[in-house]
Amino acid sequence: GLMPEEDYDLAGFAVGVVDKKDMITGENLKPGDVLIGMASTGVHSNGFSLVRKVFEKELNKEGLETYYEELGTTLGEALLAPTRIYVKALKAVKNAGVTVKACSHITGGGFYENVPRMLKDGVRAVIKKDSYQIPPIFGMLAKKGDIEEHMMYNTYNMGIGMVVAVDAADAERAMEAMKSA
């Protein structure tokens, strides 16, 4: 439909170029390589149809400005936390001399659809869910919407916005580079 005259919709995108020699293809990925997850800032830009359904009653000025102790902020601030951009961290890893063998931006389809895309045949991922903190917005969504864990991981990034694979010998150096970025 048409938007009211006083409303607006804002969208943006970026286009990049990469030399073929610098492409991250996953072809050198092997069993024993290490996956490193980079923290997300929250929901990012996916799963908002479900967010709207779950928080239907709160999607007004009063509801969005309500402070929630478990979030440490208002619902509106938690839902609209800017999407983290990972280019600085990836550049820092490259500048540290670490080869990123494969990577996956955890967007639509969540963990369960995106991580397998970075893997080549014969390689599987083992994710230790207790190795990182899940931002509280996801717990609130799951509880309020009565959403099963599998569906949450199939829809949202669950606190990890990007996953990279590196050689086990390079894992510590890669993580230090990411922290410094």
Feature names for model-found ranges:
Residues A14, S45-E56, T155-M162:
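A short, terminal or domain-edge coil/loop segment
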Residues L29-E77:
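Acidic, glycine-rich loop-and-beta core segments that form the ion-binding/anion-interacting portion
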Residues M3-L10, N60-L80, R84-A181:
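Glycine-/charge-enriched secondary-structure boundary and capping motifs
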Residues G16-V18, D33-L35, A39-H44, R52-F55, ...:
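Glycine-rich beta-alpha junction loops
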Residues G1-S49:
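Glycine-rich anion-binding loops of enzyme active sites
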Residues M23, S49, V54, V115-R117, ...:
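Residue-level recognition of conserved structural "scaffold" positions that shape functional pockets
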